[in-house]
């Protein structure tokens, strides 16, 4: 019989308050949906609850008419015994472009002041330079740094690559290392091998995040538990599986009586699940939670493309009347990814690679046109690409070798916080407001102006679709492109 390589209880982070509903219901769970369950969630004994960051910040203002900072303060008050965790996009903070170091620093400070304990910091390209400031600031203000490996598969992204990256992040001050398997590509045996190699190389805890899009998530978590992973992400059953995380209750029951027994109380989880089943049903009745997201999608395994990317690809092609080109685009995505130096397919690189692949196929000629985001990526504006870029493609985009950015992209940015404070002094009532306005200048002004108006509090805003002028809108997948 296989033996566990650790005898420590497996720690659990539950994503029910953040990634579970972001993955299944477009981040539409309200604070009112959460409040009735906070007391029981706080009593379960989780390592942490992921409850903020990612798309929640934008969605609060854009769709739910909520102040994201007030949501965080409310959660902190209702969860006094549980560490609160957020997802942070490195130099992008919670947006889709790079911000100056002083803005990153202020956002880390205010996140921690308002209740966050653990900040999971990732960069889409695994460029550690884009993590430097967020790591430094999180530590300065007393937060726990969970530095992230954005997991993917390519000729560049070997086990040795990720082990080396983890060691570098540990040396930069990471308090824990997260394996972020956003596309559910990390298979069970590979998870065992990677976790084992990491445990032999680094001394900080290892936290595994995956999804269950391809139906392998439960097995991946179990094999990681055998290999000695310290913490895993799961979601309470009403919003688990499919594009979300594997179910918390299932893993807790599986490990009961083993050396990795979590010690968590299933009966308390059952109480919480009763409430969240009602929330999930409400979201389903409203047409927000589509039952399709609960299905197993093995295309992820065949094409190494995230499940959400596939569904949005179909939507894009339908809009263009080009559904017959679906498999052509599927074949083109890995070719574009190779030409672009094998970026992991996570925001924003998934949008950029996907859009370029669609354009290449629809236009009948590869690289006939480049969206500005593709040019920015090839120019190095997002950071250093993991592999070698196809120089013919870069030249076709009008980028000469001397135009490629080789420094840390944020080094080209002057301090911005003072400018934002001056720009928004007529509307911002706090430094938190300044940060909201800086990150989401299209949506935050209207939200803040209406925040204290009772008429706007009656119901969540039925917000219009993001306009093309809004670079920071919540994105399903692709950068907007008119065929």
Name each model-derived stretch.
Residues 11-19, 47-51, 82-90, 119-120, ...:
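Hydrophobic faces of well-ordered beta-strands that scaffold small-molecule active sites
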Residues 36, 42-60, 290, 294-299, ...:
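Terminal or standalone catalytic/regulatory effector modules within metabolic enzymes
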Residues 121, 181, 227-244:
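Glycine-rich phosphate-binding active-site loops on the catalytic face of alpha/beta enzymes
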Residues 157-169, 214-230:
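Catalytic cores of alpha/beta
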Residues 219, 244, 252-253, 262-322:
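Core active-site phosphate/anionic-ligand binding loop and the adjoining beta-turn-alpha structural block
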